UniProtKB/Swiss-Prot annotation:
Localization per record: Nucleus
Pfam families on file: BHD_1, BHD_2, BHD_3, Rad4
Biased composition (Polar residues): 101-130, 226-238, 720-737
Stated role: Involved in DNA excision repair. May play a part in DNA damage recognition and/or in altering chromatin structure to allow access by damage-processing enzymes. Involved in nucleotide excision repair of DNA damaged with UV light, bulky adducts, or cross-linking agents.
Alphabetized UniProt keyword annotations: DNA damage, DNA repair, DNA-binding, Nucleus, Phosphoprotein
Comp. bias intervals (Basic residues): 288-301
A Gene Ontology BP annotation from the UniProt entry: meiotic mismatch repair involved in reciprocal meiotic recombination
Cross-referenced InterPro entries: BHD_2, DNA_repair_Rad4, DNA_repair_Rad4-like, Papain-like_cys_pep_sf, Rad4/PNGase_transGLS-fold, Rad4_beta-hairpin_dom1, Rad4_beta-hairpin_dom3, Rad4_BHD3_sf
Descriptive protein name: DNA repair protein complementing XP-C cells homolog
Taxonomic source organism: Drosophila melanogaster (Fruit fly)
Stretches with biased composition (Basic and acidic residues): 18-30, 520-578, 598-612, 693-711, 806-818
Length: 1293
């Protein structure tokens, strides 16, 4: 291509292009690399905008395999074009300049005329080049204006302005394509130098094109391997960017042209086969001609560290590596950073300490958070106090209503069977109370097991009407109404009966979620006091999923699947665990695939279902179960069956391993929960449904037992043996229960997977039925002698299953008959002396015939259709002839002929006693390791359940009961009406809501008494700390405390003995603030043990335990003086502590850590006031008289509270002193409080008379001042009116 053609192609480029043409001498006559033209054009089309118009012929002339030769001496030969590789050309072409530096016209190392305008571009001998090529300055002038430089950026000290070196400078090296990104229509990128070489006739080198293609593939393979094994491209690209930016500010001084020529020759050799050596900092950068001018303005040298060169590769192969990395970084932003465009680098200094401003800001934030948390806590305390007062007021209202309502008492007295039902002359006895409670329980039916009714009346009249209506129908809507009816009846009969309420106010402390999280250190997350933020938790989710996938992989590794298949299914297995946990809620939906895959997913999910079931049962056994926790067992078993049906598995796929593990786990679960929990009747239906589902499942598994043997693995056969051993143990227990008197376990079917279940597990599934009116299905204990034996046998019969109970009742028939003949079992005949025939006709005729008519017993109609084995034979034969008539002769509401069955009684949720847990199995079967591993993690699974039960309180909790005073026993007797028990503190504590912190007794004289110490087992340790401060509570209930009687004194002594007889606490923390015991380490600053050799009550960890009575308060001399006591002479301080900081007026500093001597009460004596002599009042150092107590008044003086007496005494020249009665702290200091004056006795009358005269004079003066002010105001008003009238007359306005 000729020079004219080349100029026509690049007509829009630069007007000063002819200036840059070097001399016509060409060294070597080498042509450019035209073989790279095609590849370069392809790269240019995929690269930056603005290069689309370039022709392939011109673009191919950019690259050259060989390095440029240096300029020899001062010869005016044309320099050979710089030998830049294709890698450097495209790398610099598509790399925009960094954001942080201003752009400059061109590079310094290129030695172009435009580079001289840059501040950093110091091109030597540039002026000489201009002189040599001056005639070519007449091309386009418009392009020159685009590259004009601000004169402020010129470097006047550069060699450009040195005139002596103009002729010696070599021809400059230039780049015609500099700034090509700013030209949109440019089609030519080569200078005249490349066209001159084109004329030389050099041939194309096609080998370079093939080498470029091969190196491209090799580079891609190397990069793909490097992404997997070596450091990611992100780090490499970041290193390149940092090195490039570090080179921006370096100023290079070229030493000589010979050094440049020598280094160019070295690059030639390196490009032909030798490994590329890193150039020095002074070496010119091998930047491409196609690179943007902005890069060349900033970058004089590009370090070789930015280019990765492989041994044996050409320069073009080196380019392929870097370019491929850059292109891949643009395509995949997730792996490598985007190094194009504006770039900012921020280096995080994590190891440095925070600055003072950051510390101040952090401390301020922490202070604000602490203040807000304190406000939240204070607000919660106020809510606690308000709710407590509201509940106290409500209970007082109902107690007053029951005592003042005569109509309610009259209505309840009509319920009595005879006039002889009142207490005897001896008073209330235990025998009478037991008969009375049993009769009342059978007479009044309980409709709902809830404590409160659904609709509670608002006014007193509505409450009375509701109670009267229930008394008339002989039924109670809820437990509260039944208790109210009993209290009204007992008080009407003359017994001392009081209402006991377990108050449940709002929590004393707010929940942790309600507080603002406070971190002790901003960077330390482990020491934070609260949980992390939601964003942090979301970031940690993938980490947890990876950890959760590890156990799944371990389980699947036991199967025959290859390792490659495991890697492919890792993600699915990691999701198997959360999916299987969600099956307990019935939300799992899985898809069936191949047979081995389904088997493994089934094994994982079923194991996790078992784990959740076992842990839910464990948590429900520890705490009193609530309504939310009850459906858990049934839902888990139903979800297990639904899981099998959804998977679409045949019986062959149901492995014996799953069945055996389910059997073992369910047996362990039921026995463990029955041992620890006081399960309520709401929990039993769920147990029955779970047992039913397990039975159906095991029946299916047993039907396909032969087919399972073919599929079972060695681990499954091992579990089979354990399940068979378990069945043997259960059958042995059944056989032993038939022979022994006390059954150990309940009989279980051979196909039943449940061992040690309660009776409810064997009952048929419940059918939907209408709610019926039922009473309490518990047979009360009427025997008052041999209480321990009866309790043991009673608990055995309750815990056994129906079949075992039937056998036990048959064995104990004789014993039951002998007991039933005892008069203690019966209500006295006088209590039920009169009967009505009409009531007898309502009973069952068959039972009436079987019952003996000679004795009157308690009516068992409320258990007429209970399980036959549950009833005693002597009582089961009793007819309804024992129905109790009414005194008023009114028609009674007839009882139903048939009582509901035992299942209905259980479903009615009326009693807790029937469903007490069974006895624990002594020899439990050996559990598999999988079950033991699951037990370790149950605490994590139980947190959600415990939190839910804590929020939802049980609606059937018995937080109300009754206490009756026994004259014979001389104590208050607690009664559980719903179970018919007396002296049942433990039963009441179990049935009440946990946390008995406020148990108050509301007596018949409208007074209030705190009886928490009787019912709270941990009153002295934990519950006492859960209450509000004692001072506030005492002040609140003080108006409602009755006068102290003999009964109160006796009760207080009993309450004190309850805790004094208990053993010592087991931990050191429980001794802190204990009301009875103390450790020396827990003594406060002003406390001490006296006597010094106080007797020890025990030891804990080698530390002596003392009585709280030995702890005494110690005070300093000044504090004892305020109590009118002084330290005895010669007494040594019992203890020396650090005094509080004091302000020294002389030095105006705060004195700290001064020793303070403190003394005990036994080291002090009463204060003896001094005597006034010669009319002078004795004073202290401050001129005042300390009168903290009346006894501290000095002798022969009087205390006169007359204001202004000091002024009168000064006039009369009589000694007088101020009386200090205390100190007040305000305005940041302590100020004395004065009250009156102290004068001698002989001056009392004189001073008093003078003060009265002075008061009269003061009154006259005040009157004169008042009159003067009034007259003066009138005078001003009159004068003002006169002036106004005069102005009106004068100016007419």
């Amino acid at each position: 291509m000729s020079d004219e053609e080349e100029d026509s192609v690049s007509e829009g480029f630069s007007a000063s292009e002819d200036e840059w043409k070097p001399s016509k001498d060409v060294k070597g006559g080498e042509s450019s690399d035209d073989d790279d033209s095609d590849f370069d054009e392809l790269q240019a089309e995929g690269g930056a905008a603005g290069s689309s118009g370039r022709s392939s012929a011109v673009a191919g002339k950019r690259g050259d395999h060989k390095a440029p030769s240096g300029i020899k001496g001062s010869s005016v030969k044309k320099r050979k074009p710089t030998g830049q590789s294709l890698r450097s050309k495209l790398y610099n072409k598509y790399r925009p300049p960094p954001k942080t530096f201003p752009t400059s016209p061109s590079q310094q190392k290129e030695n172009t005329p435009r580079a001289s305008g840059s501040k950093n571009a110091k091109t030597p001998n540039e002026s000489g080049a201009r002189n040599q090529h001056g005639p070519a300055d007449s091309s386009s002038e418009s392009s020159v204006e685009d590259y004009l430089v601000n004169p402020a950026d010129l470097d006047l000290h550069s060699t450009f302005f040195a005139g002596g070196q103009k002729e010696k400078s070599p021809a400059p090296q230039f780049d015609c394509n500099a700034g090509i990104t700013n030209l949109s229509d440019s089609g030519s990128e080569d200078n005249n130098e490349s066209s001159f070489e084109d004329k030389a006739g050099n041939a194309f080198d096609f080998r370079g094109l093939l080498e470029n293609a091969n190196s491209l593939e090799r580079t891609r393979d190397a990069l793909s391997k490097r992404n997997v094994t070596a450091t990611p491209p992100r780090s490499q690209a970041a290193t390149m960017d940092v090195n490039a930016l570090l080179a921006l500010g370096e100023n290079q001084n070229y030493q000589s042209v010979e050094v440049e020529e020598r280094e160019g020759n070295q690059r030639k050799k390196a490009g032909r086969g030798a490994p590329a050596a890193p150039p020095t900092l002074d070496e010119p950068s091998r930047l491409s001609k196609t690179k943007s001018t902005r890069i060349k303005r900033h970058t004089k040298t590009r370090p070789v560290s930015t280019v990765v060169a492989n041994a044996g590769d050409t320069d073009d192969s080196d380019f392929e590596e870097v370019a491929d990395a850059d292109l891949s970084s643009d395509q995949d932003d997730g792996e490598t950073p985007n190094i194009s465009g504006d770039l900012e680098i921020r280096v995080g200094l994590e190891g440095l300490r925070p600055t003072k401003e950051q510390k101040t800001q952090h401390e301020l934030e922490m202070a604000l958070k602490r203040r807000l948390n304190r406000d939240i806590k204070d607000r919660q305390i106020l809510l606690h106090k308000v709710s407590l007062m509201c509940q106290i007021a409500r209970s007082l209202k109902y107690n007053r209503l029951l005592s003042e309502s005569d109509s309610l008492m009259q209505a309840t007295l009509k319920l009595l069977p005879s006039r002889n039902a009142y207490p005897t002359e001896r008073g209330t006895e235990l025998k009478y109370l037991q008969s009375f409670v049993t009769w009342f329980k059978t007479s009044i039916k309980l409709l709902s097991p809830n404590l409160y009714s659904a609709q509670s009346p608002a006014t007193k009249e509505a409450i009375l009407e509701a109670l009267l209506e229930q008394v008339k129908r002989k039924e109670a809507r809820c437990k509260q109404d039944m208790i109210f009816i009993f209290i009204a009846l007992a008080r009407g009969m003359g017994m001392h009966c009081r209402l006991i309420v377990n108050l449940q106010p709002m929590p004393l402390r707010p929940a942790a979620s309600d507080l603002i999280p406070i971190k002790l250190r901003p960077d330390d997350k482990n020491k934070s006091q609260t949980v992390e933020s939601e964003r942090e938790s979301e970031d940690e989710k993938p980490k947890k999923d990876k950890k959760a996938g590890k156990p799944a992989e371990k389980e699947s590794s036991k199967s025959t699947i290859s390792k490659e298949a495991e890697k492919k299914n890792n993600a699915k297995k990691a999701e198997a665990k959360p999916l299987s946990k969600s099956t307990t809620k019935g939300s799992e939906t899985t898809k069936s695939g191949t047979v081995p895959k389904v088997k493994k997913e089934l094994s994982l999910s079923s194991k996790l279902v078992e784990k959740s079931k076992h842990q839910k049962a464990y948590t429900s056994s520890k705490s009193d179960t609530s309504f939310d926790e009850k459906p858990s067992t049934s839902s888990s078993s139903k979800c297990l069956k639904e899981e099998y049906s959804e998977l679409g598995l045949s019986k062959k796929l149901l492995k014996p391993t799953l069945s055996s593990k389910l059997v073992l786990k369910s047996k362990n679960q039921s026995s463990f929960s029955s041992n620890k929990s006081d399960t309520s009747f709401e929990e039993n239906p769920s147990t029955s449904s779970s047992s039913k589902s397990l039975k159906e499942e095991t029946a299916k598994l047993s039907s396909s037992k032969l087919e399972d043997k073919k599929v079972a693995s060695p681990a499954e056969t091992k579990t089979k043996v354990q399940s068979s051993l378990l069945k043997r143990v259960t059958t042995q227990n059944i056989s032993e229960s038939g022979d022994s008197k006390k059954p150990k376990v309940a009989p279980v079917d051979t196909f039943s997977p449940v061992a040690g279940r309660t009776r409810r597990a064997t009952v048929k599934p419940k059918t939907e039925e209408k709610p019926q009116v039922v009473g309490s299905p518990v047979i009360p204990k009427l025997m008052l002698s041999k209480v321990k034996q009866l309790n043991a046998k009673h608990s055995d019969t309750e815990n056994a299953s129906p079949a075992n109970k039937h056998l036990q009742e048959q064995r104990n028939t004789r014993e039951t008959r002998s007991r039933s003949k005892s008069p203690k079992v019966l209500i006295s005949p006088s209590f039920l002396k009169k009967k009505s025939d009409g009531a007898d006709s309502t009973s069952d005729p068959q039972k009436h015939q079987m019952a003996p008519e000679t004795k009157a017993r308690i009516s068992p109609n409320f258990l007429s259709e209970a399980l036959p084995a549950r009833q005693l034979r002597s009582r089961g034969q009793k007819a309804s002839s024992l129905a109790i008539p009414q005194l008023d002769g009114g028609d009674d509401v007839p009882l139903p002929k048939k009582r509901p069955k035992l299942e209905k009684l259980k479903n009615s949720q009326d009693s807790d006693e029937v469903f007490e847990p069974a006895k624990p199995v002594k020899k439990a079967p050996v559990l598999p390791k999988s079950v033991q591993n699951l037990r370790k993690d149950r605490r994590v699974m139980s947190t959600d359940d415990e939190g839910g039960s804590r929020l939802n309180r049980k609606t059937d909790a018995s937080d109300m009961w009754v206490e009756v005073w026994s004259d014979v026993e001389e104590q208050w007797i607690c009664i559980d009406l719903f179970k018919g028990k007396l002296h049942c503190v433990d039963t009441i504590r179990k049935n009440a809501t946990p946390g008995l912190a406020y148990v108050f007794a509301f007596q018949d004289d409208q007074s209030l008494k705190d009886v928490t110490a009787r019912y709270c087992a941990s009153w002295s340790t934990t519950v006492r700390k859960a209450r509000v401060e004692k001072a506030w509570l005492d002040e609140t209930i003080a108006p409602y405390l009755g006068r102290r009687t003999k009964r109160d004194i006796t009760e207080d002594d009993q309450l004190r003995r309850i805790h004094s007889d208990k053993p010592l606490p087991k931990s050191i923390s429980e001794f802190k603030d204990h009301p009875l015991y103390v450790l020396e380490r827990h003594l406060l600053k002003f406390q001490g043990l006296y006597p010094p050799d106080a007797p020890t009550l025990g030891f804990i960890r080698g530390e002596a335990v003392y009585s709280r009575d030995c702890v005494h308060l110690l005070h300093s001399r000044e504090i004892w003086l305020k109590s009118a006591r002084v330290v005895k002479l010669g007494e040594q301080p019992y203890k020396v502590v650090k005094a509080r900081p004091k302000w020294d007026r002389l030095t105006r500093t705060v004195i700290k850590d001064q020793p303070l001597e403190i003394f005990g009460y036994w080291q002090t004596q009463e204060y003896e006031p001094p005597t006034a002599e010669n009319g002078i009042v004795p004073r202290n150092a401050y001129g005042n008289v300390e009168l903290f107590k009346d006894c501290m008044l000095p002798k022969k003086t009087v205390h006169l509270r007359l204001p202004g007496l000091m002024r009168i005494c000064k006039k009369l020249n009589i000694d007088c002193a101020n009386a200090v009665v205390g100190f007040d702290f305000h305005q940041g200091a302590c100020h004395p409080m004065y009250d009156g004056f102290i004068v001698c006795e002989e001056f009392r009358e004189v001073v008093t008379a003078a003060w009265e005269e002075d008061q009269q004079v003061q009154v006259l003066k005040e009157q004169e001042k008042y009159e003067t002010r009034v007259y003066g105001n009138w005078k001003k008003l009159i004068k003002g009116l006169l002036i106004r009238e005069r102005l009106k007359k004068k100016y007419n306005f």
